[in-house]
Amino acid sequence: MCRERDPQEDPASPEAGVLQVLDRQLAVGGQLVTFATAAAVYEDAFVPLHGEYQAHNALLALAAAEAVHGGRRLPARIVEDGFASVTSPGRLEVLRSSPTVLVDAGHNPHGIEALTGAIEEAFGFQHLVAVLGVMADKDAEGVLAGLEPVTDAVVCVPIDSPRAMDVDDLGEIAQEVYGADRVVVSQQLDEGVAQAVA
């Protein structure tokens, strides 16, 4: 459901002229979000992605779509259909269940903060193991420090890139953050994933 904005609304009021995520509720497979744009309020739009950051990304996409259409309110059906087809490969993407395997391309402490918040909000994991490879120019210690509070262990794996951090170097950093008993170093990605889900 959506309503058009009253042009007489005070532009300084929370209801007028700004982009806002007014409400978010967990839903199976994503979240129900109420968006406010300069043109309308869109209530309970289903966004099939997890995390507060994805609600804000969806809000920006919605505002861009309104701008393309002359700044007008979009029909509710268009908004529903548009969000229903949204995917975000590599961002808190569920690859399989039983056990659940997620993939996320977060590569800095800020991205990991968004990831861990979304994991805690959307999933009730009793046991969580991170499988991690890092580029050499990234803040590996900061990424590991962000993951450590929400994971039981970390499996360090190589990345197939000339820019990748050596997996043994990553393992040493991980041991400083997690302690040696919570770190596994695997020389192959597939073996590392198998160790994590075992």
Task: List the model feature ranges, each with a label.
Residues 1-26, 47-51, 78-85, 93, ...:
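Beta-strand->loop->alpha-helix junctions that form or flank phosphate-binding loops
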Residues 33-153:
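Nucleotide phosphate-binding/pyrophosphate-handling subdomain across enzymes
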Residues 1, 8-10, 28-34, 100-102, ...:
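C-terminal helical cap/extension that packs against the catalytic core
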